[in-house]
Design a protein with these regions (language model features):
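An exposed tryptophan-centered "aromatic clamp" motif
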Residues: 31-44, 50-99
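Short solvent-exposed loop/turn micro-motifs enriched in small/polar/acidic residues
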Residues: 1-2, 75-76, 110-111
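Short, P/G- and charge-enriched loop/turn segments at secondary-structure junctions
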Residues: 102-106
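Short, structured beta-strand segments at or near domain termini in extracellular proteins/domains
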Residues: 81, 107-126
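Extracellular adhesion/carbohydrate-recognition regions
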Residues: 1-45, 115-119
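A ubiquitous, low-specificity "background" feature that marks scattered single residues
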Residues: 16, 58-60, 107
Length: 126
């Protein structure tokens, strides 16, 4: 049986992504999880920014459809909601999430439970 990889390197952004989400957790738990994560001998994992999560989507399909799909080369495909590290500026008890079932970007309380998929590499903030 072929074993699934633990990471995936994005050829577009050169960021390395955690392949499997460990499940749902609060934003605070997600930060702790990322700080303790070690995959493939690397321990510099972090929660992605909202812009980094957005790089997984093919926004060009937005004109053909109501909701963009994940880019074709992204190997993990799901319709779950993921935490970003980006705090909502107007209400710091909230952070941005990306809902991949509709490519929605929304802010929710950091005490809510959403999935996390860690990333490593040069941070995209603009």
């Amino acid at each position: 049986m072929k074993r699934r990889p633990s990471t995936w390197k994005d050829p577009k952004t050169v960021m390395e992504w955690q392949y499997e989400s460990p499940g749902e957790m609060t934003w605070y738990e997600a930060l702790e999880y990322a700080q303790s994560l070690s995959l493939d001998g690397k321990d510099d994992w972090r929660i992605p920014t909202v812009l980094e999560l957005d790089t997984l989507l093919d926004r060009k399909t937005l004109f053909d459809k109501m909701r963009p799909d994940m880019r074709k080369e992204v190997p993990f495909r799901d319709t779950l909601s993921y935490w970003s590290s980006t705090t909502f500026a107007e209400h710091t008890k909230n952070a941005w999430i990306v809902m991949f079932d509709g490519a929605y970007v929304l802010s929710y309380y950091k005490t809510n439970h959403y999935h996390v998929r860690c990333v490593r590499g040069q941070e995209i903030i603009k």
